[in-house]
Amino acid sequence: MGKASRRKKVAVSADQPAYRPPIPFVERPFEGLPNEVELVAMREIIPCAVLSGRTTEEHGGAEFDIVTLLPDGHPAMIRPDGRILVGLQTRSNSGDLSHDVAAALLAALQAQSDGVDGVIDIDVREPAPRLQDIVDPKAFSDMEIVADFGYWFDPNQELTPEMRDALEQNRADVVPTAAVPGIEGMYWCEMNRNFVRYVSAAPEHKLFDALARLQAAGNARLGEGSRFVGAFRACGLAIPVFELAEGASAEDVAADAKALAENVEKALKETTPLSADERRARQGLVSRQVTIR
């Protein structure tokens, strides 16, 4: 028997799914949306929050809520009152979170039109529009940070004792978080110590140049007893983290936060090269940066 006849023939099954190209990776998925900073914060650092929006007229002008988390990390849910909820902290993701949120929203809209409620699942590998393509950018509300996952339930529904107990347990497990008054993107949280995390839409290299200038001058802090401790990189944005003086609340640091934000804005406009001290400060800042997505 010849070599050719001894070769194993590979049969192609008719049931074998067709090749699906992967969803292209997008480093900064929510870029271009007016609420980019809030969406990144909800995805990465805020445990419980709600942001309301509306689709374009082409997609029905439907109102919906983007929320931090849904039961078991599902991507979408339709409450018994018909309200559509789309989750950001989900179990499965493609390389483009904007694609995933839009796919979940469209799936929920279809389920709603079919008279379905409850949790909705999607396959994030399937092609779909991006969030920027299907929402009205002018229709977003202000984000609301809430104490628990009460948004899972119809607000007109009387909760059972089991539901109330579950919410109480969830509330006990949630890291206390609050927006620093008057400063976009700054969020206070209480863990083993109190911290402020600053989500900035400024280009990362420019932001670290600005922070280096402030650090070298001793101004990269939020009041007495605070210090810069590092940074995250998430959804294409840098998120500097400041440890606060013991017991300091969001309100306590509001004035210092305002001064820091103003100083960062001024430093972002600076075009002179970094000094030697500023370069050393920048190296220290970058060495403490961690990518979480």
Regions found by a protein language model. Give the residues of each.
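Long, contiguous binding/interaction regions
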Residues: 5, 172-179, 289-293
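Alpha-helical oligomerization segments
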Residues: 225-293
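N-terminal membrane-targeting/anchoring modules of bacterial envelope and secretion proteins
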Residues: 1-149
